[in-house]
Curated annotation (Swiss-Prot):
Gene Ontology molecular-function annotations: ATP binding; ATP hydrolysis activity; transmembrane transporter activity
Chief subcellular location: membrane
Record-listed E.C. numbers: 7.6.2.-
Protein residues bound to ATP: 43-50
Gene3D superfamilies reported in the protein's UniProt record: P-loop containing nucleotide triphosphate hydrolases
Pfam families linked: ABC_tran (PF00005)
Descriptive protein name: Lipoprotein-releasing system ATP-binding protein LolD
Oligomeric and partner information: The complex is composed of two ATP-binding proteins (LolD) and two transmembrane proteins (LolC and LolE).
Membrane topology designation: Peripheral membrane protein
Family in the record: Belongs to the ABC transporter superfamily. Lipoprotein translocase (TC 3.A.1.125) family.
Amino acid sequence: MSNPILEMRGITKSYNAGQANAVTVLRGVDLRIAKGEVVALVAPSGAGKSTLLHIAGLLDEADTGQVLIEGEEMRGLSDARRTAIRRSDVGFIYQFHHLLPEFNAAENIILPQLANGVSKAAAAERAAGLLSAVGIASRAAHRPGALSGGEQQRVAFCRALANAPKMLLADEPTGNLDPGTSDQVFDALMNLVRDTGLSALIATHNLALAARMDRQIRLDAGQLSDV
């Protein structure tokens, strides 16, 4: 595999070290994701997949090991540099949408762009295009409370892609939806990912959805293996 967008080498992570309730979550994890590759991370609840995603996305730091994004080592970077990389290069999606309730769908997509220095006009144009791409352009002026669960998650997808990241990290992105809605929303996500050429690491316990991705890996007992 050449030109990885993400490379993790020997990642370990423990909590409460030295205490009676100490737990090791990740044990020497190695992972490479190529540009444009979509990888399914299959793991049961509590296996450490959220921790792995947070370390990959610079929201947390490993105890040992290296994280490289496009070949750049993340350890030792200033907080400002890590934040800049996280904002520009990484998009996050969670099981719950975390949309700002006081803003409408379009505004939830516009705001992260403004924080990244994009003009309001350009941000509004991109928001409209993303909402159209996931089939809910007509819902742009609606606040999250007026949207269905599937619509809320589609807006969350658009927000994650607002700043045109190079890599998408998703933690059970359809886990809070019923099966029928889950399939439709996942289709919308995959279409966005494929159309933009994104690399993606998507955690899911849904084996049918995992099978639709380029590759599957399993996290168990703190270690990764191919499925």
